[in-house]
Amino acid sequence: MLLFVGLGNPGAKYSRNRHNIGFMAVDEISRRHRFSPWRRRFQGETSEGTLDSERVILLKPTTYMNESGRAVQEAASFFKLGVGDVTVFQDELELAPGKLRVKVGGGIAGHNGLRSISAHLGNDYRRVRLGIGHPGVKELVHGHVLSDFAKSEMPWVEALCEAVADNAELLTGKRDSTFANKVHLALQAKGFLDKGDAGAA
């Protein structure tokens, strides 16, 4: 069994925020793979299903971003999962819009959701980093992540979430590089990334 966590803030006010792209990604996994309806538990919402014969629990913490670790720890404890069974889908300022990286462990780069999860679980969980781009200067970061994607950005956001969902089965087998390559190739095919953008996980 694996736990896939999408990070974001709860409520309609935040639903299209850049900070909520993790929620958007797991919503699309649930839709594409016909997981169970979302239900409230573990200080969040869960949807359950199977990817490549592996049972997967999707979790969207409703604690707000800064306390995400409480929900993740509660779910992981209930299912007796280790930190290596947890994958977190997060927004990433340091990646260009539409780009993706997969990494196990590492720093939190100022991300409050990751800080909370690391405080509760330790650091050795997998992160699927979904690029939202950087506003250019540090002072604009807070407003950038908590503002909505522009209407003109939604095509690449939707394409990224769809590609993540279409290839999510690869994550159950730890085929992280293949997953990242396939996602980037899907975005290239739709004209959202240049040919040189694929290949790195």
From Swiss-Prot:
Whom does it interact with, and what assembly results? Monomer.
Please indicate which residues carry the site annotation Stabilizes the basic form of H active site to accept a proton: 91
Report the protein name in the record: Peptidyl-tRNA hydrolase
The function of this protein is:
Hydrolyzes ribosome-free peptidyl-tRNAs (with 1 or more amino acids incorporated), which drop off the ribosome during protein synthesis, or as a result of ribosome stalling. Catalyzes the release of premature peptidyl moieties from peptidyl-tRNA molecules trapped in stalled 50S ribosomal subunits, and thus maintains levels of free tRNAs and 50S ribosomes.
Native source organism of the sequence: Bradyrhizobium sp. (strain ORS 278)
Q: What's the EC number here? A: 3.1.1.29
Read off the CDD domains from this record. Answer: PTH
Reaction(s) catalysed by this chain, per the record, are:
an N-acyl-L-alpha-aminoacyl-tRNA + H2O = an N-acyl-L-amino acid + a tRNA + H(+)
